[in-house]
Curated annotation (Swiss-Prot):
Top-level taxonomic group: Eukaryota
Cofactor(s) the protein needs: heme b
Reaction(s) the record says it catalyses: Fe(III)-heme b-[protein] + nitric oxide + H2O = Fe(II)-heme b-[protein] + nitrite + 2 H(+)
Lineage of producing organism: Eukaryota, Viridiplantae, Streptophyta, Embryophyta, Tracheophyta
Gene: GLB1
Native source species: Trema tomentosum
Protein name as catalogued: Anaerobic nitrite reductase GLB1
Amino acid sequence: MSSSEVDKVFTEEQEALVVKSWAVMKKNSAELGLKFFLKIFEIAPSAKNLFSYLKDSPIPLEQNPKLKPHAMTVFVMTCESAVQLRKAGKVTVRESNLKRLGAIHFKNGVVNEHFETRFALLETIKEAVPEMWSPEMKNAWGEAYDQLVAAIKSEMKPSST
């Protein structure tokens, strides 16, 4: 493992919990992605300013035509990354995508506080699969999220393109 990767191990049990819950959530990823982002904006209203199409828009967030597709993409990428974590031993977002994500977050002025979306993700998952939710599942998704954030942060620098 390189120094840019998180040294924590994602266990087989954690993987099973993430895979099982993602299998249930996947079919609703558009709605869940939107819920995730609405929770983020509830927790950190200033995060809306990071999105040019939300900044001065009079359209309610949940009706914004650009937010739902973006939210779904982010939610699916986050969950798919979590599912692959143990098998790959690291975050599996393609390196080019990781570099692009890092550069975009850097360019848009995303700071550490903006990554405090962990709670929003965990709450979204908890509400999506209440019958499966447990402290172990919370820890599994939390660990996967932490590793993805660490990978993105390691690429947060100006784009080389």
